[in-house]
């Protein structure tokens, strides 16, 4: 389904600090003009997936759709860079994403909240394996996971770190989350689970002083956590725009057959 866009949408161009992205921004601004975030109909993010995630974290609450163009090393969430931007915006297909909402408690008693569009990952901070218990909707499912850590990934993020950790690729719009252990030692046979998107997930670090654990929501890291609660956000939603010949749903599907 294509998204209705005005014939000459007002575009705010955003770019990573990389020289190719900065140069492209200047060229596009000279051709199409530029406006503020507040006045824009659409945001155009120039860079890689890392910059796209930073753009969503910074401007996601604005409600503006975001069209990304790949000028970085990784561009799963981006479109290819082309000159015919207005035509591509007219034909673009929207993908609506809900981020994960994370609440972390640290050893010192500090509570930290963050959003994640790709994944939330708990990781051991030292050479010693982490001990983590896993509760789903208030019920303990794993008394003690021993390993490097654990990931909760959205469908959009399931092809990234989650997939590298041998987690499942989730179809876009499936309203599911991937729960994937990282290098698990015990339970030996547990390889993760696919959860409904409205599941409340709670991790407790069982030996935080001897075996400290950090948590990262996309790129926001909090160290020395003792408890982490994750649920899908019910308040925030972002819209990414993709070229119809290679939309996000097709990209996720294609990743399952990559060799």
From Swiss-Prot:
Residues making up the signal peptide according to the UniProt record: none
Active site: 49 (proton acceptor)
Cell division among keywords: no
Keyword Lipid biosynthesis annotated: no
Catalysed reactions, semicolon-separated: NAD(+) + ATP = ADP + NADP(+) + H(+)
Family of the protein in this entry: Belongs to the NAD kinase family.
Protein's UniProt name: NAD kinase
Organism: Xylella fastidiosa (strain 9a5c)
Lineage of producing organism: Bacteria, Pseudomonadati, Pseudomonadota, Gammaproteobacteria, Lysobacterales
Gene behind this protein: nadK
């Amino acid at each position: 389904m294509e998204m209705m866009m005005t014939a000459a949408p007002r575009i705010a161009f955003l770019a990573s600090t990389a020289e190719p992205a900065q140069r492209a921004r200047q060229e596009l601004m000279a051709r199409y003009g530029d406006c503020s975030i507040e006045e824009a109909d659409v945001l155009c993010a120039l860079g890689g997936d890392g910059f796209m995630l930073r753009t969503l974290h910074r401007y996601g609450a604005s409600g503006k759709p975001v069209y990304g163009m790949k000028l970085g090393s990784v561009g799963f969430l981006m479109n290819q860079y082309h000159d015919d931007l207005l035509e591509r915006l007219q034909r673009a297909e929207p993908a609506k994403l809900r981020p994960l909402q994370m609440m972390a408690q640290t050893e010192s008693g500090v509570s930290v909240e963050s959003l994640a569009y790709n994944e939330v990952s708990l990781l051991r901070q030292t050479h010693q394996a982490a001990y983590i218990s896993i509760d789903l909707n208030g019920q303990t499912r794993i008394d003690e996971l021993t390993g490097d850590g654990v990931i909760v990934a959205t469908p959009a993020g399931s092809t990234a770190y989650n997939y590298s950790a041998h987690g499942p690729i989730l179809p876009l719009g499936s309203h599911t989350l991937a729960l994937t252990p990282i290098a698990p030692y015990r339970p030996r046979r547990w390889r993760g689970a696919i959860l409904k998107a409205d599941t409340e997930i709670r991790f407790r670090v069982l030996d935080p002083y001897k075996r400290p654990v950090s948590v990262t929501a996309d790129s926001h890291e909090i160290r020395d956590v003792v408890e982490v609660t994750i649920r899908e956000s019910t308040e925030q939603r972002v819209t990414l725009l993709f070229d119809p010949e290679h939309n996000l749903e097709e990209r996720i599907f294609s990743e399952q057959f990559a060799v």
